[in-house]
Amino acid sequence: MTGLNKFGRQRLAFLRSRHPQILKKLEDHGLLQIHLYYAQKRAGWRVDQLVTAGMEEPEAEQVALREVIQESSI
């Protein structure tokens, strides 16, 4: 997969390890790339929100990881 940032790669790793059935469905329907780009975009927006609100970037990235990247719903 090209063009993925760390959040996109983390989402892919999360799906591979915890939700292979969701990963398979996304692949079968040709939606995996879109899903990963959307997840990384949402995570980036969340980090920006938190940093703007005064949180340090490493902490904000950890929150985005929990809230966006490790979410089980699609």
Residue ranges and their predicted role:
Residues 1-74:
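C-terminal alpha-helical interaction appendages
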